[in-house]
Structure formats: structure tokens, C-alpha cells
A protein has these predicted regions:
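C-terminal structural segment of proteins
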Residues: 1-287
Length: 287
């Protein structure tokens, strides 16, 4: 492990952290658990001159559920440890897909340090596919106010200066017949990447017609993305062999990961398509 050479700043509120970031600019980075930056440093990335630690900003440690507009939401402060996401009874009971995703992240020692905010801030975190299909929002402090941004939009835009304050996840009230899945393919010891991470929620009505479909895929150094074309293909259709064949083709086409020295892009796409087909077959069995 490399020796830390950066100067550490310890602000106690959001405005102070923001002011430091504006003052130090590109020579600085926000840091919480540190596992994200440790990953980058182990791969040879240079250490910044200044690190702005967020660990003394208590507002970022909040975790609660709140109703808004008739819907229930989970509010996760950016400093909530990944391990706490696994242990918290509310999350386990009402947001099990998030629990399942977090359980796959690295080793227990890393989860004890790593934060949910850091996992999202990485833009390639394993929790992101699950958060995408639950249509989570990100709370970001812009120096004046905390704004809410759809996670999907946040990933597709550049918000490099944003200070993530919380992740807000709506509760999905779905019938037991719906298929909820999260799969991570590939070994992940310490800081090595996965082949594919994919999540989905798919449901059908009493007539066997698909009336709910959300899919998201990522893996390795690839930013997770919603598979909206595939979702549209599924809407209003019944699970049958012709549809399964078409879905495999569309997932393979829509999912556009980058390959590396270990796994080609086509291999990742094929794995993602195979997983979606397997989950659709489970839905067919419930019909």
C-alpha cells in the first residue's frame, strides 16, 4: 500500500467542504472511506496534493425512510458504510435488491470502510445497477443548496465538482410474482473488477403480459446503464421463445461495454444477454 502524501483537510459542514474544493480546485479530491481512491492509487494514479475528508460532516451519516407524495423513500447519507447497508433492518426488509448488490462488493474489510456515496461517486460501483432499476436519485450540494438528480442522468452527464450528500431510493411495491434479480459475474478479490454486473425488475399481469421492466448493466470499468431499448421491447409482450430470441439480440446490441485484457466486449455482452434470458424464463415459470 502506498504511503499517503496528500494534505488532509477536515471540514465540519458542507459549505466549508465546498469552499475548500473551490479554493484548491484540481489539486484536491473529496474522500470518505478511501477505498475508491485506494483502488486508483494501486493502479498507478497520482495522489492529489490535497484530500478533503468528509468524515466529520455528520449530516452525511443520516439514514431514514420518509414518505413523499404517497410514496416511501429510503434516504442514505453518503457516508453510510456499505456494511451498514447490509445490517440495517429497514433496508433488508424493504430494499432487498440493494442489500443483495452491496453484499457482492469486495471483502468485508472493504465494506466496513467503503461508503455508499463513494461507490456511486466511482461511477462504476457494483451497487449502481441495482440503484438504477430502483430509479434512485442523488442529492448533490452545489455551494448553495442540495439538488436532487436522477442517478441515470447523473451518470450520463459530467458533475465532477458535485459533493454527493445522499442517495434517495423509492420503495417499489411489487407483487411476489415479479422477478427481482442482481447478478455479478466474475471474481472480485480486493480491488479487481467484475465481468458483468446486472440488475432487473420484471413483472407480468394476470394475463401473462409483461407490464413492468427495468434493466441495468455494467461491470469492470464500464459505467452501468439502463437497457431502455430492451425494456421497451418487453413491454406488453408475453414470454415465449420468439421473444427470448429477440431479447438476446437486443441486449447484445444495446449493452456496449469496453473489453480489457481479460474479457472482451462481446463476452461481456453475451453474458449479460444470457442472464436476462435466464431471468425471463423464471418469470415464464411463474405464469
Amino acid at each position: 500500500m502506498k504511503t499517503l502524501s496528500s494534505k488532509i483537510w477536515m471540514p465540519t459542514d458542507l459549505r466549508e467542504a465546498w469552499r475548500l474544493r473551490q479554493l484548491l480546485q484540481l489539486e484536491s479530491h473529496f474522500i470518505a472511506g478511501g477505498t475508491l481512491w485506494q483502488t486508483k492509487w494501486e493502479k498507478g494514479a497520482p495522489q492529489p496534493s490535497h484530500l478533503i475528508s468528509l468524515e466529520n460532516i455528520k449530516i452525511l451519516e443520516a439514514i431514514y425512510e420518509k414518505e413523499d407524495g404517497g410514496q416511501n423513500f429510503l434516504h442514505l447519507g453518503a457516508l453510510i458504510r456499505l456494511a451498514d447497508c447490509l445490517r440495517h433492518p429497514i433496508i433488508k426488509a424493504k430494499w432487498p435488491l440493494l442489500t443483495k448488490a452491496v453484499k457482492t462488493i469486495a471483502a468485508p474489510a472493504v465494506r466496513n470502510l467503503g461508503t455508499i456515496g463513494g461507490n456511486v461517486a466511482s461511477t462504476i460501483g457494483d451497487a449502481i445497477p441495482a440503484l438504477l432499476v430502483m430509479e434512485a436519485k442523488i442529492g448533490c450540494f452545489d455551494g448553495d443548496d442540495i439538488k436532487k438528480i436522477d442517478l441515470d442522468h447523473w451518470l450520463n452527464e459530467e458533475f465532477k465538482d458535485d459533493l454527493i450528500t445522499e442517495i434517495v431510493v423509492p420503495e417499489i411495491s411489487a407483487p411476489p410474482s415479479y422477478v427481482h434479480f442482481y447478478q455479478k459475474i466474475g471474481r472480485r478479490e480486493a480491488f479487481s473488477g467484475s465481468v458483468v454486473t446486472i440488475a432487473g425488475i420484471i413483472g407480468q399481469n394476470d394475463n401473462g403480459t409483461i407490464d413492468f421492466a427495468r434493466l441495468a448493466a455494467g461491470g469492470g470499468e464500464n459505467r452501468p446503464r439502463r437497457l431502455r431499448i430492451t425494456e421497451q421491447l418487453l413491454a406488453g409482450r408475453k414470454v415465449e421463445s420468439a421473444l427470448l430470441k429477440k431479447v438476446h439480440e437486443v441486449v447484445f446490441s444495446e449493452f456496449q461495454p469496453v473489453g480489457d485484457a481479460f474479457f472482451s466486449a462481446d463476452y461481456r455482452r453475451r453474458v449479460a444477454a444470457n442472464i436476462v434470458i435466464a431471468e425471463l424464463k423464471k418469470l415464464e415459470e411463474k405464469d
